[in-house]
Amino acid sequence: MNNAELTELLKGLVAIPSPSRQEKDAADYLQQRLAGFGLEPVRKGNNLWIEEEGRGDGRPVILLNAHIDTVKPAAGYSRDPFTPVEDGDIIYGLGTNDDGASLVALLEAYVRLLPLRRSFRMIWSATAEEEVCGEGGLDSILPELGKIDLAIVGEPTGMKMAVAEKGLIVLDCTACGKSGHAARDEGENAIYNALRDIDWFRTHSFERVSDYLGAVKMSVTMISAGTQHNVVPDNCRFVVDIRPNGLYSNAELMDIIRGSVSCEVVPRSLRHGSSHIDTDHPVVRRAGSIGIELFGSPTTSNQTLLDFPSVKIGPGDSARSHTADEYILKSEIAGAVEIYVELLEGLEL
């Protein structure tokens, strides 16, 4: 494929709304286009993958992964988010930066690497439900892929390599009290009870600090209490956003939190674990040898689902993701293809 074909493939995806769990039309389009390129993908649900021949030949396997779903359009778009527009080097449209550019760049890298002699096999995949960490996305096809030795997860990182990624825990907390009339000295105010726990979330510092991800971060982001001005509230609900740093398991963090606060604490999910890769891993050493900068990512991705080594690297800028007038540069895509190929061509696992 040439750069013009990659651009047209990306623009075709942008033109098809594909919010999480509604990716069918985008998957249909991509499946058809891949067949037109002579690539016959396997499909499960709204997930597609292409597997190089030779399963079971003993070579290690590298998974190249990007996602086809998007968030819903942000407020403030000055143009139709589903009408891709080229303006010089820029392509505007929802999903250009997150994650269409990585998808097409990894596909082109896969195609270029196929005829080259390598010590590993490749699987390229375009998966659904990444933005919601859904069970119908990458997680649903991993059992079909066999043993994976390394994943390259394409996300907008400016082609820096994330060797660590924060996880995510969202807590629904409820502080209880006893209702009463606000004019009398009666009842137990649940808001005051909640404040003690909120202050703990605000001030507590976890001891273990990651070199790449820093400390565990906790933020109270939503709060709700009371029914009317003259009734002492008997419950106060609040939400806490927690970003684990790889040095605590999610279960360990939950044990610490529940042992420190008095409110009821219910995690929405414990699936979003943090991830990190040994900096002595061959792919990290290879990245260093060709001048790729390493960093720790504060945002989550499909890496949270993987129990084998992975890194995150892709064209674009994370700051453009989930924003109005999202865009990617064509030069960023072309440059990413070259870096992916250089990174993998010389890799020995």
Which role fits each region the language model picked out?
Residues Y29, A101-R112, N193-R196, G335-E342:
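Short amphipathic alpha-helical face segments that pack within enzyme cores
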Residues M1-N65, D69-P73, N235-V239, L253-G259, ...:
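N-terminal helical capping/dimerization or prosegment-like subdomains
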Residues I62-L64, S125, L150-I152, V311-I313:
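Hydrophobic/aromatic beta-strand patches that form the interior of the parallel beta-sheet core
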Residues A4, Q22, G36, V163, ...:
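Metal-dependent amide/peptide-bond hydrolase catalytic core
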Residues P41, I50, P84, V220-I223:
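A structural signal for short hydrophobic beta-strand segments in well-ordered beta-sheet cores
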Residues R33, R59-I123:
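Active-site metal-coordination/substrate-binding segment of hydrolases
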Residues P19, H67-D69, T127-E131, T157, ...:
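Active-site beta-loop-alpha junctions enriched in small/polar residues
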Residues G100-V170, T174:
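Acidic/histidine-rich catalytic neighborhood of metal-dependent amide-processing enzymes
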